[in-house]
């Protein structure tokens, strides 16, 4: 446990020292939420205020960015730079490294989620009318599912360039097509089909249902099954493809 806590501290310190990562992964989602919130202030989406609708979408954007663009690409870069190889030669166990990276991503995502909610509530009068408890549960499941996908992406990528290209190709469409900023039903037919093939759609739907309607797994069974299925599949891929060098 002491080794895990120490590695989490190291990972957080590395994150805070990287101004580029902070700018794009921490500030950009918040600025996007402010932009869309201001642009659509007073509007409605799916029967609720747009600001309330936007909360789950903003958090979905954060989860996707943290999992693929931060964790996945960063892990591939550390492998290319020989950092993982050096860590592999220390007493640090693989599960400690993996756990530290997941917990670090969770801390970053939870911090951004709190800021996301605060911005929408304070600036745009958003309301959380559902169950905060179920919202937290969905968020945690989403964090585990998507960070595991980030590990799988790093393992499947030959090098940093490949990981960066794959992360952008996966994450960017999800951030704009999965009901994050606009209702999926208002999109053209082709985009709706694409959105329903992306896992972030089901995370955002389950999170929005929990936060605005108090819906649990029994009401959003399809969303939960797909998220858990992605978690299992990504876990198998991540374990089989993880390498220190």
Where are these regions (language model features)?
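A short amphipathic helical element positioned immediately N-terminal to and/or at the very start
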Residues: 1-16, 207
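Hydrophobic alpha-helical transmembrane segments of multi-pass membrane transport/permease proteins
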Residues: 14-42, 51-70, 111-112, 170-175, ...
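Transmembrane helix boundary and interhelical loop/hinge segments in multi-pass membrane proteins
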Residues: 15, 67-92
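Transmembrane helix-loop junction
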Residues: 37-41, 61, 77, 86, ...
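Membrane-interfacial helix-loop-helix junctions in multi-pass membrane proteins
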Residues: 42-47, 127-129, 175-233
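Short coil/turn motifs that cap or connect alpha-helices
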Residues: 93-94, 183
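Alpha-helical transmembrane segments and their short interhelical loops
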Residues: 94-172, 218-228, 232-236
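Membrane-interface capping segments at transmembrane-helix boundaries
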Residues: 239-245
């Amino acid at each position: 446990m002491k080794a895990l806590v120490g590695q989490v501290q190291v990972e957080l310190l590395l994150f805070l020292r990287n101004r580029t990562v902070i700018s794009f992964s921490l500030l950009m989602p918040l600025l996007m939420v402010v932009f869309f919130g201001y642009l659509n202030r007073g509007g409605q989406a799916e029967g609720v205020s747009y600001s309330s609708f936007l909360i789950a979408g903003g958090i979905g954007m954060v989860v996707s960015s943290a999992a693929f663009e931060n964790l996945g690409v960063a892990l591939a870069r550390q492998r290319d730079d020989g950092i993982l190889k050096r860590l592999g030669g220390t007493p640090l166990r693989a599960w400690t490294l993996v756990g530290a990276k997941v917990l670090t991503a969770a801390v970053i995502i939870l911090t951004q989620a709190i800021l996301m909610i605060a911005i929408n509530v304070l600036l745009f009068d958003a309301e959380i009318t559902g169950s905060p408890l179920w919202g937290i549960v969905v968020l945690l499941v989403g964090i585990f599912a998507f960070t595991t996908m980030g590990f799988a992406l790093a393992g499947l990528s030959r090098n940093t360039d490949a990981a960066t290209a794959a992360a952008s190709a996966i994450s960017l469409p999800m951030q704009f097509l999965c009901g994050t900023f606009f209702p999926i039903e208002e999109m053209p037919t082709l985009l709706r089909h694409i959105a329903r093939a992306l896992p972030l759609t089901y995370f955002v739907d389950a999170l929005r249902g929990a936060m605005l309607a108090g819906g649990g797994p029994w009401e959003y069974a399809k969303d939960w099954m797909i998220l858990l299925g992605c978690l299992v599949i990504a876990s198998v891929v991540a374990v089989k493809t993880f390498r220190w060098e």
